[in-house]
Amino acid sequence: MVSELSLPEFEAGLSASLTCKRNFACFATFAGEIIGALRGSRLRVQLLEDFSTIGKDSVLSGELQVLVLATMQELPPREQNEVARWLRALRKVHPGLVCIATIGAHENGGPGMTNFLRRQFWFATRGPKRACGALRLPKRAAFTVHPAVHRYVLDVLVHIRMHRLLDHSQAGGASSSSAEDVLDLCRWLCSANHPEKTFVTPDDVQQACAWYFPMHLDVIRLPQQEASVLYGTSMKFAEDLLIGLRTFLKKTGTVDNPLLLETLIVQEVLGKVVPAI
């Protein structure tokens, strides 16, 4: 059983992304780990390491199904945004192509990517633990989303945007497309976990939020980003809060989940928001 504080497994992320034709990110030491895991999957895979070639027509070879992107964390923000724009254009030309971003634990926390680049990927998974065999993808079916369940998703978004440890100037990382992204993931979870049902449940929403949001959250990194400073809270207090968080994460260890703090924030929000009945 996967812990609530763990990132989803690589195989689950691959299955979801291939079914829904979405990109996702994977925490791995290097892109070769992902390439090695995909060798037995019977998928047509290519590795892209040189991002200076992304504007050329010949960057993709043949009828690809999966494009593995090497680590982009060392790229300057401007170049990361250029990659993001290229991925958006690529989606229009190759709508069935799935791109997998290789990311590692960043020294400042989070995935180390610009907001624009992060939004090109659905969610983040753990690194592959074993080779992937031929995947049996669940069939996409129409699942009913009751208005109360939709409202539950929106309530979660509002609480995330208001969370004290998230950057309010960036809406906490919950963008305008987050609700539909979460609902897409809910529908896939329905088809994978209980295809006999025809509707999305609050449990599906909670699991989808736990998978989706950790990669997208904008955690405050500087004392002046703490919202209460605007209303008179001492900058020293905000700084002590951040130091305490960093100390906690160092003692806890984030080897199994580099997005542990973000995951804890999501779990706290899910514990506060009353699920749809």
Swiss-Prot record:
Superkingdom assignment: Eukaryota
Described function: May be involved in telomere capping.
Family: Belongs to the MTC2 family.
Stated name of the protein: Maintenance of telomere capping protein 2
Organism lineage: Eukaryota, Fungi, Dikarya, Ascomycota, Saccharomycotina
